[in-house]
Amino acid sequence: MEFGIYPNIKKQKIYQYLPKLIKILENQQVKYFVANEAKSKLEEKNIYINPALYKTTEWMGTHLKHILSVGGDGSYLEAAKIFSGYEVFLTGIHLGELGFLNSIKENDTESKIRQLIKQDYVLEERLFLEATILDGENHATKLPVVLNDVVIGKNQIGKMVRLSLWINDNFAQQYPCDGLIISTPTGSTGYAFSCGGPILHSAAQEMIVVPICPHTLAKFSSVLSEGDIVKITLSDREEILHISMDGNGSYDLKKGETLVVQGIRKNIRFVRFKDQDFWEILSDKLVKKI
């Protein structure tokens, strides 16, 4: 068995943990490869790995079946995006804070690696979001595919906007609000949840639309089927708004343009261990820790 390691080199904890992970893999006689972009930073910290074991993410996605994302939830989302087009199994190792998405805790690494080797796990297919900006002449600009959410609003705190929501070309509602979140089931436990949205099981195939601080009695969120197409347009008073994809990057949506979001399926699969129940994890992370 062979593993690809995608480490978050921005986390200081990675430099104490990665040598331990490598030793565990070597003790289990498992071959491993490390993402190329980590090489220089690891060597700065005096962590030296055989240069032949550094590979591009493209190589890893093409040649390997198992990818280990090492870091926090953000690292997991980044790995999901990078490897989404490959037929790989993604497992997250938690070195961050909340760690809702990752399946392996630091102290459980050795036992969970054994489970991976024994194929003692289940695979989940998760919904991704694909977003496109259409200008007035229907020229399309595709944005990066995301696993969590697409958020649109102003860059300034406390500035209300008016956004029109269309579902399958049918007008649904105009929201006076701080913004709108279009979320996958995976993202339903994140920003969407904090704004009052419903929680969906991570393996569900629906999308949700959640208004951020809506100034209206119609404060409801919408649960949409996988095949629905969401369109968002600006009111005449808005000149430009900003789009965030999984909390990263910023893309502009200008007057006269339309944001189109729809759910898509990708080749990647997500590892969940059989002794990990979604609702039990939910209670542990979002209820018991409060």
Whereabouts are the PLM-identified features?
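ATP/NTP phosphate-donor binding region
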Residues: 1-66, 107-122, 133-144
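Redox-cofactor binding/interface segments in oxidoreductases and associated redox assembly factors
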Residues: 5, 69, 182
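Gly/Ser-rich helix-loop-strand patches that form or flank binding pockets
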Residues: 83-100
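Gly/Ser/Thr-rich active-site loops/lids in small-molecule metabolic enzymes
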Residues: 170-177, 181-218
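ATP/nucleoside-binding phosphotransfer catalytic cores, i.e., glycine-rich phosphate-binding loops
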Residues: 152, 168-171, 218-290
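Catalytic core of DAGKc-family lipid kinases
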Residues: 97-178
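Short aromatic-centered micro-motifs
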Residues: 165, 187, 243
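Short glycine/serine/threonine-rich phosphate/pyrophosphate-binding segments
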Residues: 14-15, 74-79, 189-194
